[in-house]
């Protein structure tokens, strides 16, 4: 059984500039992968290649076994770009109907209404785009990306214009898509949001993969914090197996131990370190 997305040794050159160099990435059905990197890292180029909008210089990209850019592959993809624009005079329902026709979807009015309800626009289907907030337009973008029940969903900054309640709603939507078996590639600068929802993360910098794995795998141990009557004491070189000895030594020294916790780095810290290491190499 082929992966939802399989990228192998992907290379993209623009003249003498290497936008991507030997990038590998796979996403399985029902898996949500975060794509992280600074501006100019190559993220947008990678997504455009997956969509078939840009041809790679080398390597292989397939969507459920179909070469990227083929008609069969494009029919399996839903895409929400970071920058999008819908006609101001169109209503939400008209935008959805237009994209159904562009996608040659077999969906009907029922599909449109179900998707608008799914993204929280059930009561705004007759509202014109010009009267929508940026957050509502972003929800509409999510709705159009889901037309035709895509098996691979590419989301570029899907929560950037949403308030906290809207971001929670998107997280719940992503969980529902995961249950349905939809594969998702999520590009976002909101690392706290990414950390909450993804199964794996790939970090690229200057066109090269600098880190990949689950958030737990990428988190580096940062020692042990012990709370005593005198406050929190940090043991930077300690690991889990060192905790009993640390506690025993403190108790023997007459200290009262109230709490012990392992310290690990956040995804933001891992990201900053990976990008810094990649820039220095």
Model-derived segments and their meaning:
Residues 1-11, 277-281:
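ABC-family P-loop ATPase nucleotide-binding domain
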Residues 1, 88-90, 135, 182, ...:
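Short, surface-exposed loop and linker segments with low hydrophobicity and enrichment for Pro/Ser/Thr
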Residues 5, 12-186, 191-192, 196-205, ...:
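ABC transporter nucleotide-binding domains
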Residues 215-281:
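Short, charged/small-residue-rich alpha-helical element at the C-terminal edge
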Residues 3-6, 70, 108, 185, ...:
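Serine/threonine-rich low-complexity intrinsically disordered regions
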